[in-house]
Amino acid sequence: MDLAEIEIKKKDADIVNLDSIQTFFLNEFDNKQGSPTQTIECANKCVDLAKNPEKKRAFIMVGHMNKSGEMAGLRTLEHLVDTVLVLDGESEDDLRLLTSTKNRFGPTGEVGLFSMQEEGLIEITNPSEYFITERDSGIEGSAISVMKEGSRLLEIEIESLVSKSFMPYPQRIGDSLRKDDLNTLISILQERAGINLFDENVIIKATGGLKIREQSVNLAIMISIASSYLKKPVDNKTVFIAEVGLTGELKKVPQIKSRLKELERLGYKKAYIGKCSIDKKEYKNLEIKEMKNIKEVISDVFFK
């Protein structure tokens, strides 16, 4: 870090990028580079250089994440900086999400969507094209919902595959969803809607590799599973937005009006939601079906 400081002042840099902060060290401390002491003291040195009244600079410090998805090292590092941006994504998928988890000068939770290509990170300007598969008609095992990421509303397509298991313990696989959440939804389907999955393998994923972070997608997940099990397609202009409780009842989700307006703008024709007080006349091109529970939805979608 001592040599870096000399170089920064020599070049009179306006923006400094340290990749990564854990690889820098100060000679005045005996601790190894990457240790909590070295990391914090190097970060403190960066703060001093950034706030120097004679020459103010912007510093970008790249840091590592641990396996639980938190910043590696002391939380003090997070408190030192003005903004924390987390770049998240799986190595086998192109999708990368850039999320602001701390921002002293603006809102947090905002999300940027990018695709990792040969030439680097490319902005996803049209999420609908990226996350939704273009089809002329519906297909078995597919259902669409809308999920909130920061202030953005994203269409999300859930694909499911249900197949007979010949093993004592059926497989439940969901890369986009926590296994406990998937098992809970399967149990609700079985007990509250009569979809017997006790001897069936169930695999689900969200197209594009998007992680499911909202309960509002519960209904779409369950409908996609039921569609695959019953071998009946769902109309590709129909969407499902509701949290599903353990009783099988549909619960309303936050900002339902803005979600419905966005879906109407995108050309969807029908939306299944939980009971809530909305004026259906506001949506001229979107049929809104308020349902009480998951059993009602399955009956209306597949058996009418």
Where are the model-predicted features located?
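Peripheral, non-AAA+ core regions of ATP-driven protein-machinery
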Residues: M1-I15, I21-K304
